[in-house]
Amino acid sequence: MSIVTKALNLVPMVVEQTSRGERAYDIYSRLLKERLIFLVGPIDDHMANVIVAQLLFLEADNPEKDISIYINSPGGVVTAGMAIYDTMQYIKPDVSTICVGQAASMGALLLASGAAGKRYALPNSRVMIHQPLGGFQGQATDIDIHAREILTLRSRLNEILAKHTGQSLETIARDTERDNFKSAVDAQAYGLVDQVLERRPEESIQPS
C-alpha cells in the first residue's frame, strides 16, 4: 500500500482525559458512544455486518434512546442493504437517518426507512432512487432464474419505498424506472426525508 493510500485511509484519533489517565479512541468509536453510526461508502456484506452489530449493541446499551445514522453512500448490494433495513425496523430504539453528501440506491432506501419524523438531509446532499441492477451472465436457465429474482427484489424494494414515502406503488415503479436524482428539498417533497437541516437543532446531543 502506498504512502498516499495509507494517508487517505487514516482514521482520526481523539484523546479523552479520564480518572485513569488518557484514553484514545478512533473518531468513529468515540461517536458511537454518542449513539452516532456512520454509513459511508458502498454497501456490502462487511459494512452491513458492522452496521447491524452497532445497532444491536446500542439497543442493548439503552433500548429507549434514539440512534442516529449518517448516510453518505452510492448504494451497493441489495441483500446487504436489506440486512441493515430489517435490523433498523427490528430494534426497539427509533433510528434517525441523516443524508450528508449522497444517499443513492440502497442508501436512499435506508435514508427513507428511518423513524417517521426523524429523517433528515443536509441542504446540498443528493438522493437517487432507481431499480435494482442486473448483469448476470451464464446459461440461459440461470439467467432466467436471476432475472426473476431481480424482479422479485424490485417489487419488494418498491413496496418498502411506498411504505416509507407515502407514494403509491405505481408512482414508485414509474419513478425508479431510471436513475432519479433529487435535491434535498425535492427528497423532502417526495417523502424520502422529513426535513432539510441547515443548522443543528439546539436540543441535539452534545458529546459527554
UniProtKB/Swiss-Prot annotation:
Gene Ontology annotations for the cellular component aspect, listed alphabetically: cytoplasm; endopeptidase Clp complex
InterPro entries registered for this protein in UniProt: ClpP, ClpP/crotonase-like_dom_sf, ClpP/TepA, ClpP_His_AS, ClpP_Ser_AS
SUPFAM superfamilies: ClpP/crotonase
Keyword Lyase: no
Keywords: Cytoplasm, Hydrolase, Protease, Serine protease
Localization per record: Cytoplasm
PROSITE patterns named in the record: CLP_PROTEASE_HIS (PS00382), CLP_PROTEASE_SER (PS00381)
Enzyme Commission no: 3.4.21.92
PANTHER family: ATP-DEPENDENT CLP PROTEASE PROTEOLYTIC SUBUNIT
Protein name as catalogued: ATP-dependent Clp protease proteolytic subunit
Native source species: Xanthomonas oryzae pv. oryzae (strain KACC10331 / KXO85)
